[in-house]
């Protein structure tokens, strides 16, 4: 699964980025993204002035100077010294609202979110018209996880603000809070409102892209991300988000370009190499996919997901030892992921380690007892060991969990037929075909063989014809048809079908079936 969760907190413009990974890439599964960019605009749109508060009272004037000094220290990131001065100002002038506001901002910067909330609320209690405190309260409540409270605070700020105030940051933050509440329509409206106030506000365009994507409006989301990038070409988060949407739009080349831009801007940007590897993999560019996943591992060596997808790529690349090692490492890092043990089982079976494969599948099933894919794969390896009763039970369990598992029906049918149970095999193949899967010509051929076993030659012939209509170059269907014509006494047709099968087997250099087909032709030529 593509990594999509983005968490970003921006102080002033774009400052601190933290991207959290979500999900994993299963061997069999769908893309389930969850992009959530969080980039709070944290400087109040309303200028915080204390010079207007100058009074004839020496004590008050002294407190105001303390606040001014504290503000300067806070801007220099000398937070502890700033806190001391804000508290001195409050002690001297308990009604000095800017001191409480500055205290709240500084406490939030120090990570004391509840302290910040209390300070902003105290400022509002003293002066309900002091708009910066509502803005600061909204930020602190959002960071605490109280999105509803943040929405109320931002709305109060907007209502109390003067007409000439640039409300773009407030509407942007309001959009983030609505998005977190899953109120996507209001989030879209808020981000659009932010853009109305400031058409060049890159964060707002990026936020708009995020919620449009969640609405399923991918084309507009891509346009919004591109606009954010146009306004802020160095904005790595927007490039990353664009890459995700392009990937989902199956524009893998475009996604690669976007992710590569991220690596240029921020080489240590979390998950970018993982997602870049996925895009290469979709283009079947396995060398670049493998190299990129290795880069992702260098960046995050304890990420089991990366080892799992790397194992999958190695498996498809027929590099079985590397696949087994990657899946094994994935299961060591995180032994609670069923799909990783399933992948390990696939690799071990290909290495001939059947007992190891069985153990891996059993661990997969222990983690997820409803994992139909693992039961199907367990059935295959049990069948390899001629433990046919257990294999049949495993295939039936896969089907019981997932009645649409065409592969399990197909495997069950082949095993039942090999056990002489052609009637049940016919039923299994028919269900496979009804559900549908890749390479159905194989299943039509198997169905034809099962019909022939039962003497239902007309139905067998139709099944072979259907197989060849789907894949005219499937040698086993031609061979099966040759055997059928032989049973019907149609020698010339039989020879013709066998000769077509022989040509295809020779192209594939299948020595065993070349010999069998030659023997069948020779036997018929002796009849003519």
Which residue stretches match the model-derived regions?
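Canonical tetratricopeptide repeat
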Residues: 68, 102, 136, 173, ...
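Structural signature of tandem alpha-helical TPR/SEL1-like repeats
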Residues: 76-87, 109-122, 144-159, 166-169, ...
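Residue-level recognition of tetratricopeptide repeat
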Residues: 62, 96, 130, 164-167, ...
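Terminal, low-structured helical/coil segments at or just beyond the last alpha-helical repeat
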Residues: 44-57, 487, 493-528
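Structural marker of alpha-solenoid helical repeat scaffolds
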Residues: 92, 126, 160-163, 197, ...
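Alpha-helical segment of the N-proximal tetratricopeptide repeat
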Residues: 61-92, 105, 109, 176, ...
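TPR alpha-solenoid repeat register
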Residues: 99, 133, 167-170, 204, ...
């Amino acid at each position: 699964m593509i990594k999509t969760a983005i968490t970003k907190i921006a102080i002033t413009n774009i400052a601190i980025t933290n991207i959290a990974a979500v999900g994993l890439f299963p061997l069999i599964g769908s893309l389930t993204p969850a992009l959530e960019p969080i980039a709070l605009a944290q400087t109040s749109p309303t200028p915080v002035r204390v010079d207007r508060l100058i009074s004839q009272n020496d004590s008050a004037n002294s407190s105001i100077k303390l606040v001014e000094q504290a503000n300067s220290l806070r801007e220099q990131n000398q937070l502890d010294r700033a806190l001391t001065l804000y508290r001195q100002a409050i002690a001297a002038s308990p009604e000095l609202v800017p001191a409480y506001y500055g205290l709240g901002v500084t406490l939030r910067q120090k990570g004391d979110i509840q302290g910040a909330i209390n300070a902003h609320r105290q400022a509002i209690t003293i002066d309900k018209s002091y708009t910066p405190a509502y803005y600061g309260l909204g930020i602190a409540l959002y960071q605490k996880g109280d999105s509803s409270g943040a929405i109320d605070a931002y709305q109060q700020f907007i209502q109390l603000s003067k007409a000439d105030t640039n409300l773009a940051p407030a509407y942007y933050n309001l959009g983030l809070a609505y998005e977190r509440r899953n109120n996507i329509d209001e989030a879209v409206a808020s981000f659009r409102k932010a853009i109305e106030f400031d058409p060049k506000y890159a964060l707002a365009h990026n936020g708009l892209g995020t919620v449009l994507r969640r609405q399923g409006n991918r084309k507009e989301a891509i346009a919004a991300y591109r606009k954010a990038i146009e306004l802020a070409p160095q904005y790595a988060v927007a490039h990353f988000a664009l890459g995700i949407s392009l990937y989902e739009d199956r524009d893998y080349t475009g996604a690669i370009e976007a992710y590569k831009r991220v690596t240029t801007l921020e080489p240590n940007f979390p998950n970018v190499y993982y997602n870049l590897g996925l895009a290469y993999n979709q283009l079947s560019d396995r060398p670049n996919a493998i190299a990129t996943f290795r880069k992702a591992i260098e960046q995050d060596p304890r990420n089991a997901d990366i080892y799992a997808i790397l194992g999958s790529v190695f498996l498809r690349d027929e590099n079985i030892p590397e696949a087994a090692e990657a899946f094994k490492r994935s299961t060591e890092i995180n032994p609670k992921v069923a799909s990783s043990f399933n992948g390990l089982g696939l690799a071990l079976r290909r290495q001939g380690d059947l007992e190891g494969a069985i153990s891996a599948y059993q661990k997969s099933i222990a983690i997820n007892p409803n994992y139909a894919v693992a039961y199907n794969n367990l059935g295959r390896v049990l069948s390899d060991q001629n433990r046919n009763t257990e294999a049949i039970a495993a295939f039936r369990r896969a089907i019981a969990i997932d009645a649409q598992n065409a592969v399990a029906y197909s495997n069950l049918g082949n095993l039942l037929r090999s056990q002489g149970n052609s009637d049940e095999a016919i039923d299994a193949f028919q269900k496979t075909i009804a559900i549908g899967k890749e390479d159905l010509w194989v299943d039509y051929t198997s169905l034809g063989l099962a019909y022939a076993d039962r003497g239902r030659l007309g139905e067998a012939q139709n099944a072979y014809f259907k197989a060849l209509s789907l894949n005219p170059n499937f040698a086993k269907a031609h061979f099966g048809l040759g055997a059928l014509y032989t049973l019907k006494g149609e020698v010339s047709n039989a020879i013709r079908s066998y000769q077509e099968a022989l040509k295809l087997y020779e192209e594939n250099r299948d020595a065993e079936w070349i010999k069998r087909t030659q023997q069948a032709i020779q036997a018929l030529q002796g009849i003519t």
